[in-house]
Amino acid sequence: MTLTIIGTGSMGMAIAHGLKERYTLEFVARDLSKLETIKNEYQANIYPLENFDITNKNIILAVKPYALESVGKQLKGRANTLYSVLAGSSLDALNTHIATQSSVRIMPNVSAKFKASTSVMTGDEHKRAEAEEIFSAIGDTFWVGSEKEIDIATAIAGSGPALLTLVAEAMMDGLVKEGMKRPDATGITNSLFKGFAPLIASNHPALIKDSVMSPGGTTAAAYAMLEEGAVRSSFIKAVGEAFKVTQK
């Protein structure tokens, strides 16, 4: 299968990097100089956006959400399937601006580059198996039953990596504050996140916490400080705020 990626920003290229070993890719964008660079790197066909014919193509739309209308005006023909990774852009909006036989919304994240994305999706049910096959090439996939659910999931699936960078940076800064060299603080924190992934995949967060929290110990003291600073509440509110933005 050939997949046509429209949009060559960070998300589009992260997805492309994850898919390149399994699919034939072609790229469409406004920036012709960037397209030439991509052509050399991926040995792929490239096309300017203006008047690009999407007839019978399987499209991965990875432009900025605000550009949906203007990009749609540049395209002609009717796509076979439109896979959109535009946060907050509804299926109705997509189908209004881009002619397609079928459409699926996906919310991946930039970890797609490392085949470790969390991709939440919804759309035409008959395209579910195909969508899961394509996006399983870049990580885990989760099909949900409504657009509201994918908008909620955006707060974690899409924005989650940025939220976790706050945690990672704060941990690094804490180690440096207490006297550790920055490279060591960075390496230790990175290793912690690497080891935590398989741990959280097979254990409930509360069980992990309880297993390492000793009475009067270091973990209990640190955890109490986070609760005092309303970190848990702030994260819950952050998810809510991200969801609100998708509804605008």
What residues fall within each predicted segment?
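Non-catalytic terminal and connector segments of soluble metabolic enzymes
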Residues: 6, 14, 47-52, 60, ...
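A short glycine-threonine-serine/GTX helix/turn-capping micro-motif
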Residues: 154-162, 209
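Glycine/small-residue-rich loop that forms an oxyanion/phosphate-binding "nest" at active or ligand-binding sites
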Residues: 50-53, 58-127
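Residues at the starts of beta-strands that form the adenosine-phosphate
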Residues: 2, 24-26, 81, 102, ...
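NAD(P)-dependent Rossmann-like dehydrogenase/reductase catalytic/cofactor-binding core
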Residues: 187-190, 194-248
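Internal alpha-helical scaffold of NAD(P)-dependent oxidoreductase catalytic cores
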Residues: 41, 93-102, 118-152, 163-202, ...
